[in-house]
């Protein structure tokens, strides 16, 4: 719970982490550092049309849901 901090910043960070997991950029970064440019196992998937569950619809949850809608995701929310 961080009521004094920017809900949008937290929601954007959450989306960045979701994209990192989705597109496997953390693995790609490590491979490039090892001079391995193979794409094996690095293909992610599109978020558009996927359903994402959000637990908590306070200020941060609402900001995150707005971002997800921008990516074309369907949202299931629980508060």
What is the predicted function of each stretch?
Residues 1-29, 41-44:
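Phosphate/diphosphate ligand-binding glycine-rich loop within oxidoreductases
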Residues 2, 10, 32, 52-54, ...:
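Extended aliphatic helical segments
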Residues 31-39:
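A short, charged, Gly/Pro-tolerant segment at domain boundaries
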Residues 40-79:
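Rossmann-like dinucleotide/phosphate-binding beta-alpha-beta segment
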